[in-house]
């Protein structure tokens, strides 16, 4: 099985940041990306398990994968 988190277009390390900082950093990073590019987000704030999927729905980005069983959490989104 292939790891969906390999070879993202951009990576954002949000470890150590607490709500609302991770989502603010994601938003800032996504603004600088082209439609269709992927972003790997690495975080350790439990609030991201709710906030990142919600951000993707609200901003119409696609959440391609998420791994939240252990720290650090990983999310892969595609800019919509």
From Swiss-Prot:
- Offer an example of a GO molecular function term for this protein: sulfur carrier activity
Q: Which domain of life is it from?
A: Bacteria
Q: Does the keyword section mention GTP-binding?
A: no
One Gene Ontology term from the biological process aspect of the record:
tRNA wobble position uridine thiolation
* Entries under Pfam families matching the protein: TusA (PF01206)
For this record, an example GO cellular component is: cytoplasm
Locate the active site.
19 (cysteine persulfide intermediate)
Keyword annotations: Cytoplasm, tRNA processing
Q: Where in the cell is it found?
A: Cytoplasm
Gene3D superfamilies associated with the record: TusA-like domain
Coiled-coil regions in this chain? none
Q: In which pathway does it act?
A: tRNA modification
Could you list the residue ranges that cross the membrane?
none
Role according to the record: Sulfur carrier protein involved in sulfur trafficking in the cell. Part of a sulfur-relay system required for 2-thiolation during synthesis of 2-thiouridine of the modified wobble base 5-methylaminomethyl-2-thiouridine (mnm(5)s(2)U) in tRNA. Interacts with IscS and stimulates its cysteine desulfurase activity. Accepts an activated sulfur from IscS, which is then transferred to TusD, and thus determines the direction of sulfur flow from IscS to 2-thiouridine formation. Also appears to be involved in sulfur transfer for the biosynthesis of molybdopterin.
How this chain assembles, per its entry, is: Interacts with IscS.
Q: Hey, which family's this protein in?
A: Belongs to the sulfur carrier protein TusA family.
Protein's name according to its UniProt entry: Sulfur carrier protein TusA
Origin species, per record, is: Pectobacterium carotovorum subsp. carotovorum (strain PC1)
Source taxonomy lineage?
Bacteria, Pseudomonadati, Pseudomonadota, Gammaproteobacteria, Enterobacterales
What gene, per UniProt, encodes this protein?
tusA
